[in-house]
Amino acid sequence: MVVTRAWSRRMLVTDRHDLQRFVDAQSEMFDEVRSELRAGRKTGHWIWFIFPQFNGLGHSATARQFAISSREEAAAYAAHPILGPRLRECISLVNAIAGRGIRHILGTPDDLKFRSSMTLFAQVCPGDPIFTDAIGKYYGGEFDALTLDFLRSS
């Protein structure tokens, strides 16, 4: 394998943020996640590592373990060769669900976590409309105010 300088830099950023924790958590569950989203209803416990949110918004040990701590980490997650495509695939599956609100699809409070996650990624990936499409479809275009506050103060 030829390692380019750009690839090396991306991997250093990825390693610095320990994104492997997300890859590891997803490895055994990703097929189940896809299946649940295709069926239009989340039933498992995976929201934290599929749709991560900014640090400080979740209070459980799992939420803290999978919290995104900076804009740079969120950008690295979105650009990661495994996590980025999986994130977009899952958002596409959610966005393709017709006739159901996000609370029915994800349950509560996971509907709030999804909004927070979409807000975070929309802010760090402004050229990628998939995040704002989800906000538009399920939240009337209203971003999560707490996530925006955390991003402003970080």
Predicted regions: what they are:
Residues 56-62, 122-131:
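Short helix-capping/linker segments at secondary-structure and domain boundaries
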